[in-house]
Amino acid sequence: MVAGEIIKGVAAEITNGSSSSVVQKYLDCANQVAPDPGNTTWVLLSTILVLGMMPALAFFEAGLLRSKNTLSIITQIMSGIVVLTVMWQAFGYSLTFGPDQKGIIGNLDHAFLINVSYDDCSPNAPNIPAAAYAFFMMMFANITPLLMTGAFAERVKFKAFIALTVAWEIIVFYPVAHWIWGGGWLHKYFGVLDFAGGIVIHTSAGVSALVIALYVGRRKDFEKYGGEFPPSNLPLATIGAALLWMGWFGFNAGSALAAGNIATSAVASTQIGGSFSAIVWIILSAAKGKPNTVSVINGVIAGLAGITPASGYINSQYSIGLGICLGLASYYSVVLLKHKLHIDDALDVSSVHGLTGIIGSLAIGFCAELSVNPNGANGAFYGNPKLIGTQLLGVVSVAVWAAAWTWVLLKIIDATIGVKIDESEEELGLDLVEHGEFAYHNISLQGNENHYSSVINSHDFFK
């Protein structure tokens, strides 16, 4: 980072009344002679690990859905990756991490990654090249809206998915990420903490997922199956979950932006939290019948999502209790939403990601220690109960923003191109209706051969 940019940045932050820690980021960058090779290597490896989480998410979700919708979820996620990558490179990074505009959003100074150096650091990451940080954060920006696909699976048109993903990323994710990670109002003025995305990613996506599930309504035969449609390929789902688990170490420990004690602590917290949450799910599922595969993998994902915001701020021993709380809360949230309220969040995104992200973010207010991460704060257990209120402010602000805008975007998209497929198309499956393909060629059309022909003849890609 050149001297002029450093001076300009420090002056702007002082003028805006930023905390000394925010100003210090610029000074740390100025004092850094060159990016550290070891830290740069770790962040680049973490970037690759988080990228791998996205096809892993596709495997996980495809295996849990019905076979006639396998390719649709894979196509949504893989298409989302490339669209969101282009957006981030063109303007997303700049809106998120560009110079702050009244605490709300960045500007377009770094559009198309202009002046994002491959040689010098950035204030957000004083030990690595600015470009390495930009590409690492690209993966977070990419995966966030893709998490929502599990909530509305098997019901939403592909073009509606693309429209919602693009609009949601711009209106929800970029501002929220700026508020907490990019020098915006929640961190600058209140000190809201989110190590790797419990608020920015899991709360925003989880709350939005619930809104979408409510908006699009239940799938056909929801009551018949009690909300638990038979999965098509549990081994595929398990492989996806295992790859997600592995990638989560890059997600959480990579957020330390250095290969050191904070990254090590995040690795420990991630493994412990995910494991204890899974144990809770195994015990509860066994108590109701038999321990099943879906419970194991959902329990792991719930724990990993919930430990995400706290992993770099708390002693890893707290991950035991937090993991247990996350397992209990997510399990009974699924029972409440799906089996009591009959909300068809197909893959329980609101419970496994949303609720756990909220709990983990609030846990920072109790368990955070400056001795673990000097860039954080002490929580209530260490003499600072105000941090609980700070974290609550962050969670509520992001949840309300995400929920409100998601509903508005759905209404606009529905009024223009439509959101949901009709019931007869749902019967055939999105693989055929939206993409003209089958994942498995032994799928029965179940007496719908005539409708199959009409669907084929109605789509341009068969002409």
Curated annotation (Swiss-Prot):
A single GO molecular function term of this UniProt record: ammonium channel activity
Keyword Lipid metabolism found: no
Record bears the keyword Transmembrane helix: yes
SUPFAM superfamilies in the record: Ammonium transporter
Phenotype of gene-disrupted mutants: Shortens transitional period (when fingers and migrating slugs assess their environment to determine the appropriateness of that environment for culmination and fruiting body formation) of 1 to 2 hours and rarely forms slugs under standard conditions of development. Gives a slightly enhanced growth rate in axenic cultures.
Primary site of residence: membrane
Protein's GO biological process: ammonium transmembrane transport; asexual reproduction; intracellular ammonium homeostasis; positive regulation of aggregate size involved in sorocarp development; secretion; sporulation resulting in formation of a cellular spore
Residues exposed to the Cytoplasmic side: 61-76, 149-160, 216-233, 287-293, 338-351, 414-463
Bilayer-spanning residue ranges: 40-60, 77-97, 128-148, 161-181, 195-215, 234-254, 266-286, 294-314, 317-337, 352-372, 393-413
Intracellular or extracellular location(s): Cell membrane; Endosome membrane; Lysosome membrane; Cytoplasmic vesicle, Phagosome membrane
Domain of life, source organism: Eukaryota
InterPro entries, sorted: Ammonium/urea_transptr, Ammonium_transpt, Ammonium_transpt_CS, NH4_transpt_AmtB-like_dom
Record PROSITE patterns: AMMONIUM_TRANSP
Keyword tags: Ammonia transport, Cell membrane, Cytoplasmic vesicle, Endosome, Lysosome, Membrane, Transmembrane, Transmembrane helix, Transport
Membrane topology listed for this record: Multi-pass membrane protein
Extracellular side: 1-39, 98-127, 182-194, 255-265, 315-316, 373-392
GO cellular component: a single term: endolysosome membrane
Family: Belongs to the ammonia transporter channel (TC 1.A.11.2) family.
Protein name: Ammonium transporter 1
Organism from which the protein derives: Dictyostelium discoideum
